[in-house]
Amino acid sequence: QYENAWDKEKQRSYSKHRTTVGKLVNGKVQLGRKFLANNPQYKDIEFKFEDHKLIAASDLPTVNDAGVNAVLSKTFPLNAGASYVLKEIAQQDGLLGDLKAVFPHHWKDLLALAMFFVIYPERNLANYDITAAHSQLGGNPLDSQRISELLESITADQRQQYMKRRLNHSCGGENNNFWAFDTTSISSYSEILSKVAYGHNKEDPEMPMIKIALLIDETNGEPLYYKVLNGSIADVSLLRNLFVDLAQLRDKQINLVLDKGFCSEHNFLMMFRNHVGFIAGLRSDLAIAAQTVDQLMPSLRLALPEYYSPTIGCYCATKQIDWYSATRAHGKEQYPFYIHVYYDKQREASEILNMTELVESFKARLEKGEVPNAPYFRKFFKKKKDKPDGVKPKDLYEFDVQSWVTFTRTCGCFVLGSSEVKSAPEALNIYRQKDMVEKAFNNYKDKCGGRRIRCRECALEGKVFITYLSLCLRLMLERRLEKAGNDPLNTPRVLERLNSLVLYRHETDDKPKLYWQGIPQEDRL
């Protein structure tokens, strides 16, 4: 018991009167000895503390076992914390509104399936109905047949409408914001999917695959656009398809970040003509890149302070050239092009050391009578002239010193090209953010069930769309965690803890009532 009063001089409240009754133990009041000595009449009475009052247990209403069992039989625990957070994020970032607009009859089921992939990445859709019955995912606990029907019902026009809405919400391409574009391969065991084909599969060259192209907003990390492609299509030939799609989806200028896989004079000219800003990794065998490296590297290797940029931690220099083109279709064209050359001494030492170890391993294999079948072996070892074919491999091949000199000339060097960004440090900082698209692919494959494609032809596009939605939700969650000072790598653990929070659903004759279990202090904001 206590009574507070106001101190006018100190302008604060203070305790005017306080009486200690006892302490609270497991919901029951344990009266203190001093209080009982002064109030012996309360010795044998059990008290509980409710609504900030001491109430005798005998005055509380009693509930018989039959009533308790009746309530419990209509009350079901649901894992709900993770789905609640993901749905709130979807609501705040506009994803939920876009789903409702494009899929007015199925948005709940689509969102539920996407959240299922995020929360339970190790499970497949065959377990969805069982999991959904014990989770607050929303939508209906669909069985495999109903899921297939839902996936098949998602049309190309609906997917285009949805991505158009997401692209228009993005600020990419405005105020010098960039979108990162890249592709990944997904292996498939299917022998009937039309887009499955053999190509450059980094994970398993012996397996056919499909390709997924993905466009990521570097500002907020959200995937904005994706496309399922034939597995045999090379990266260098994809940009034309991208521009055609984006022209239909968005009428504002875009800026792209591209890796070396898209580096070709044809692609650069196509981006110039389409007024697409870009920062791209340049291959060393590209003529304009090789010429610029030869001109700038001698100065950079001197490590003069004027070439050092502390913001990127390496030496850099820029050369502006004019990109010329003359064709019958377009006439004479001229565009400004900025070539940024970077030199990192630590990277140089690492590249030389790694290649030295690889060369030594080739020599050891030759000593054993093996001829390595590797590009770098063919680059640094040449067949000796006038040697019969029957000699031992170690006597048939010799180390090519000139190739090694050519290799070391560009060690520690890397080159970027840009149509817009004139500053070398700024260009590299933007390019480094491209690792978001790499992380997105890893999340797609490892955390969202995208390592293998197992579905029928008619459901393929729908399955990829659901996985794309789940990737959006996961990356949005990671960005929230990062802004709050948490490590995004802890996302699986955060999801697991959130999913342990229970929501009780009590069925009534009218509308089901929902009650949250007490949330532990460490999980509260």
Each model region followed by its residue ranges:
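Dynamic "connector" segments at or just before major functional cores
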Residues: 2-180, 184-192, 213-232, 240, ...
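Secondary-structure transition/capping motifs at alpha-helix termini
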Residues: 8, 135-141, 157, 172-173, ...
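Secondary-structure capping and boundary motifs in well-ordered enzyme cores
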Residues: 108, 143, 177, 206-209, ...
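Glycine- and acidic
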Residues: 108-117, 133, 222-229, 251-255, ...
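Short amphipathic alpha-helical "interface-anchor" segments enriched in bulky aromatics
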Residues: 128, 427-454
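An anionic, glycine-rich sequence signature occurring as long contiguous blocks
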Residues: 208, 228, 275-430, 499-524
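Catalytic or ion-translocation cores adjacent to nucleophile or general acid/base/metal-coordination motifs
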Residues: 227-228, 233-244, 248-251, 255, ...
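Polyampholytic, low-complexity intrinsically disordered segments
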Residues: 285, 460-525
